């Protein structure tokens, strides 16, 4: 996993920590190494080891040391430029230097299983023999880029990217996804075993607090969230008189000062805010895969008002605690109904709790993972 899992509360890192928690529990049967590259600051290693004492942390920077400038130029920078010129790939993000240093780790340890996060780093195992390799896909990258760069991608480029993504996938023994839609796509085209991993949410011990927060929105600052919250504030929020919106996460940096919008930034205890929230919003005009923040809110029994893309990846599209809105009027109407109609609110809240209990418990996720690693 490239990023320090404690560097933010983004959904991909939340899920990474859930997997690390599982691996930490099976250390009696396995010696486990976690290789990561970026966003590690002083003191972060100690925090990681206190959380996951049974996992060996290996920090491997993307770039090699620059202490010897001549060596760095010839062994890192120049080789990267040559690869970009003669072996360009729309998917591959691995430099020759990083490939070489990662393969040394593989050679030194002789792993039974190797799990790579993100298809962009799939080439790290292209020369590996003898290990069972797993791609933890996280996202359908071609679709992610299409929605992010839709004005700049031709159908020809998208076709080439899709081909490159599938080619990278075929070098693995199996592929993990947590989206029901992406499972179907990968199974049809990748010709590899695709395993649906349920994203688990620990059942929170909910402190009974006064519901002082009308609306809560928790998000990172990825481009999909930035454009979606802009739409919400411009098109939906003006339709909600006397309603307060509390915003949490890096997305706050992209939100202007607006009446009745309270920006909290990054917070230490997210549960304390969920416990006080009546309704969660997830405006989502584009994007791929399951939305971890939707699952987080549902796990607290909080109904979620969202767009069609907000329920992508969910195993059940109906009676799950989410209200899907096709336009700004419907989005505002759903919020008002939840805030004003107690019986309707209770129904949607109970649906959220039931959906999470049936599909996203830690027990269900561990059962699937145990089947992978024969940990029974």
Model-derived features: where do they sit?
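N-terminal subdomain of nucleotide-sugar transferases
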Residues: 1-58, 107-109
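Conserved catalytic-core segment of nucleotide-activated headgroup transferases in glycan assembly
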Residues: 15, 162, 176, 196-263, ...
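Membrane-proximal helix-turn-helix segments that form the acceptor-binding/catalytic region
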Residues: 21-22, 97-104, 135, 141-142, ...
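Donor nucleotide-sugar binding/catalytic pocket of nucleotide-sugar-dependent glycosyltransferases
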Residues: 134, 155-158, 166-205
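Acidic donor-binding loop of glycosyltransferase active sites
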Residues: 275-289, 300-303
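Short hydrophobic beta-strand element within catalytic cores of glycosyltransferases
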Residues: 293-296, 303-307
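Conserved acidic donor-binding segment of nucleotide-sugar-dependent glycosyltransferases
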Residues: 321-329, 337-343
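A charged, aromatic-enriched C-terminal amphipathic alpha-helix characteristic of glycosyltransferases
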Residues: 343-374
């Amino acid at each position: 996993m490239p990023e320090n899992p404690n560097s933010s509360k983004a959904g991909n890192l939340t899920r990474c920590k859930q997997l690390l928690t599982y691996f930490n529990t099976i250390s009696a049967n396995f010696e486990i190494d976690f290789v990561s590259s970026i966003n590690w600051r002083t003191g972060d290693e100690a925090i990681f080891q206190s959380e996951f004492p049974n996992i060996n942390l290996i920090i491997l920077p993307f770039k090699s040391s620059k202490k010897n400038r001549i060596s760095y130029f010839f062994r890192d920078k120049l080789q990267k430029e040559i690869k970009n010129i003669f072996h360009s790939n729309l998917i591959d993000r691995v430099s020759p230097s990083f490939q070489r240093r990662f393969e040394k780790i593989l050679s030194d340890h002789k792993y039974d299983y190797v799990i790579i996060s993100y298809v962009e780093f799939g080439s790290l195992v292209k020369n590996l023999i003898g290990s069972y390799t797993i791609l933890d896909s996280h996202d359908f990258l071609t679709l992610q880029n299409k929605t992010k760069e839709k004005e700049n991608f031709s159908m020809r480029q998208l076709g080439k990217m899709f081909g490159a993504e599938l080619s990278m996938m075929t070098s693995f023994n199996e592929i993990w996804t947590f989206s029901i839609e992406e499972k179907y796509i990968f199974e049809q085209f990748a010709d590899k075993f695709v395993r649906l991993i349920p994203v688990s949410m620990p059942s929170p011990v909910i402190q009974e607090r006064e519901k002082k927060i009308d609306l809560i929105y928790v998000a990172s600052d990825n481009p999909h969230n930035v454009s979606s919250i802009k739409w919400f504030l411009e098109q939906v929020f003006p339709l909600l008189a006397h309603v307060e919106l509390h915003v949490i996460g890096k997305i706050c940096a992209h939100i202007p000062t607006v009446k009745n919008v309270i920006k909290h930034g990054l917070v230490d205890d997210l549960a304390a805010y969920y416990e006080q929230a009546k309704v969660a919003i997830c405006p989502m005009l584009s994007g791929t895969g399951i939305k971890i923040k939707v699952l987080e809110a549902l796990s607290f029994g909080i109904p979620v008002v969202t767009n069609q893309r907000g329920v992508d990846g969910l195993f059940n599209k109906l009676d799950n605690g989410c209200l899907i809105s096709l336009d700004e009027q419907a989005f505002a109407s759903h919020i008002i109904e939840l805030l004003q109609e107690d019986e309707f609110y209770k129904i949607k809240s109970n649906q959220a709790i039931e959906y999470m209990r049936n599909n996203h418990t830690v027990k269900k996720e561990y059962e699937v993972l145990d089947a992978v690693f024969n940990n029974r």
